[in-house]
Amino acid sequence: MNSISSVFSSEQSVFIPYISLGDPDYDSCVIWADALIRGGAGILELGIPFTDPVADGPVIQKAFKRSLAHPFSMDKILEVTSEIHKLHPQIPLVYLTYFNPLFSMGLESFTERAKNSGIQGLIIPDLPFDTPEAEEFFSQLERKRIDFIHLVTPATTEDRIRSMKSLASGFIYYVTSYGVTGERGSIASGLEDRIRMVRKIVGLPVCAGFGISTSDQSKVISTYADGVIIGSAVQRIIEENGSDRNNCADKLLAYASEIRASMR
């Protein structure tokens, strides 16, 4: 099993696609993950569906709605995660999740089982890092060697970024634009300078996400970001083709290969 940090040991930017677990069903997600990894994913983000995904745009909200149309359980989430890990044990898996599903399961139980299923990192958009609850959770993650990946937005101050330094691990998820997730037509101005500043302060790889969907965008961003994160464009392929597993897997493989080939 490779660590997240080892994935960033080469000079090439890392492709990090995202899928919503359970969309359109759990078995299909193993096939989607396999296609994306074969297409060049270096890390895979797995979204845990939630009823109130405040940071997510319409594509991922609809994916969660489709996922939650089936019986939901963290047991099934962990089982599917383990299946993906067994197929590609060399690829680090990261959960992108809201805090409530983890809290409902019990944080100690979750961290133990997540680690055993192959999870190496967590991204939790609605968990502030400077609360007593977060500090206790971070201690549990550290004991299990699970990275906590912090989000930095265009509005995050330099002082707040500095305060993340002692707690952040794995990489920094840099949110490239204001608002929720979703595909956008242009790259935000000043993105390169901002990413370089965050990397200098925190001393971790910085990966860019939110709004990236095309190979032209990934080609440019990969020249200065350590990784490129793409979620909504991947989920749109699943939304439009998920009823035909073979066709959808082929389209995901082709898309991942195109993005990977564009990156520096």
Swiss-Prot record:
CDD domains per record: Tryptophan_synthase_alpha
Describe the task this protein carries out: The alpha subunit is responsible for the aldol cleavage of indoleglycerol phosphate to indole and glyceraldehyde 3-phosphate.
Q: Which family does it belong to?
A: Belongs to the TrpA family.
Metabolic or biological pathway: Amino-acid biosynthesis; L-tryptophan biosynthesis; L-tryptophan from chorismate: step 5/5
**Active site per database record:** E45 (proton acceptor), D56 (proton acceptor)
Classification via Pfam families: Trp_syntA
Name this polypeptide is given: Tryptophan synthase alpha chain
Protein's organism: Leptospira interrogans serogroup Icterohaemorrhagiae serovar Lai (strain 56601)
Please give the subunit comment from the record: Tetramer of two alpha and two beta chains.
Keywords for this protein? Amino-acid biosynthesis, Aromatic amino acid biosynthesis, Lyase, Tryptophan biosynthesis
**Gene Ontology cellular component terms for the protein in this record:** cytosol
NCBIfam families, alphabetically? trpA
Give me the reactions it catalyses: (1S,2R)-1-C-(indol-3-yl)glycerol 3-phosphate + L-serine = D-glyceraldehyde 3-phosphate + L-tryptophan + H2O
One GO biological-process annotation of the entry reads: L-tryptophan biosynthetic process
Q: What class of enzyme is it?
A: lyase
- Which InterPro entries does the annotation name? Aldolase_TIM, RibuloseP-bd_barrel, Trp_synthase_alpha_AS, Trp_synthase_suA
- Show the GO MF annotations: tryptophan synthase activity
Tell me which EC number(s) this protein carries.
4.2.1.20
